[in-house]
Amino acid sequence: MEIIPAIDLLDGACVRLHQGDYDQVTRFSDDPVAQALSWQSQGAKRLHLVDLDGAKRGEPANDAAVRAIANALDIPVQLGGGVRSIERAEDLLNCGLERVILGTVAIEQPDLVQVLAERHPGSVVVGIDANKGKVATRGWLEQSDVLATDLARRFSDSGIAAIITTDIATDGTLAGPNLDALREMAQASSVPVIASGGIGCMADLLSLLPLEDQGVSGVIVGRALYDGRIDLAEAIGAIGDDRLQDITCGSTDLA
């Protein structure tokens, strides 16, 4: 299973929000390039970026940092947040990003997702951010009536590379992942599902392993890495693709 460190960008700095609340911001670093290089040096195989300003306003606000990170790293970089047009998505791919993540437009302009997936195979990911099972959009500031699982089914055969599913209720809380919601998403999707939200310790990461065979291929980790609750290199060794053995749910190693 792939462990993907997250860098959330707000006003050019690395931050984390609590349950997506822009009024509950924790600032971790003023140098996102140095932070990105640190995750790479610790063994990350991919980096996840979020333009929080872009997600909120619908227009890019951290492009200087995004481009600097893409140019500095040797590993693939993906970005979500405010990617709401073909032109914006292709600009990001042309500047060195491996993948773009489409969230709001997946609800509002589903045909755009299809077009981009056909033009750029393997480079388009759909981000499904859910609150009580229903999709939230525009930086989580608006709530739709669309079920997250229905949206996953809608794009399963569209040629996208993966679905990133974020449980808003647990995001930034360190309270553990919503395993039931993850299982439902994996069952609804025929493409790999990447989990996001709630990871607070190694036991949380290990709890995802039984879902790997059901289609959960990776996990995005943010606050737990910044707080030092999880060591990235250790986590990669425990649940990464090169791990020595699987650890079952009932194992005492989860303690």
Curated annotation (Swiss-Prot):
GO biological process: L-histidine biosynthetic process; L-tryptophan biosynthetic process
Localization per Swiss-Prot or TrEMBL: Cytoplasm
Listed pathway(s): Amino-acid biosynthesis; L-histidine biosynthesis; L-histidine from 5-phospho-alpha-D-ribose 1-diphosphate: step 4/9
MF-aspect GO terms: 1-(5-phosphoribosyl)-5-[(5-phosphoribosylamino)methylideneamino]imidazole-4-carboxamide isomerase activity
Enzyme class of the recorded protein, top EC level: isomerase
Catalytic activity: 1-(5-phospho-beta-D-ribosyl)-5-[(5-phospho-beta-D-ribosylamino)methylideneamino]imidazole-4-carboxamide = 5-[(5-phospho-1-deoxy-D-ribulos-1-ylimino)methylamino]-1-(5-phospho-beta-D-ribosyl)imidazole-4-carboxamide
Cellular component aspect of the GO annotation: cytoplasm
UniProt-listed Enzyme Commission number(s): 5.3.1.16
Keywords tagged on the record: Amino-acid biosynthesis, Cytoplasm, Histidine biosynthesis, Isomerase
CDD domains named in the record: HisA
Primary location recorded for the protein, binned into one broad class: cytoplasm
Catalytic residues in the record: 8, 129
Family label: Belongs to the HisA/HisF family.
Matches recorded under PANTHER family: 1-(5-PHOSPHORIBOSYL)-5-[(5-PHOSPHORIBOSYLAMINO)METHYLIDENEAMINO] IMIDAZOLE-4-CARBOXAMIDE ISOMERASE
This protein's name: 1-(5-phosphoribosyl)-5-[(5-phosphoribosylamino)methylideneamino] imidazole-4-carboxamide isomerase
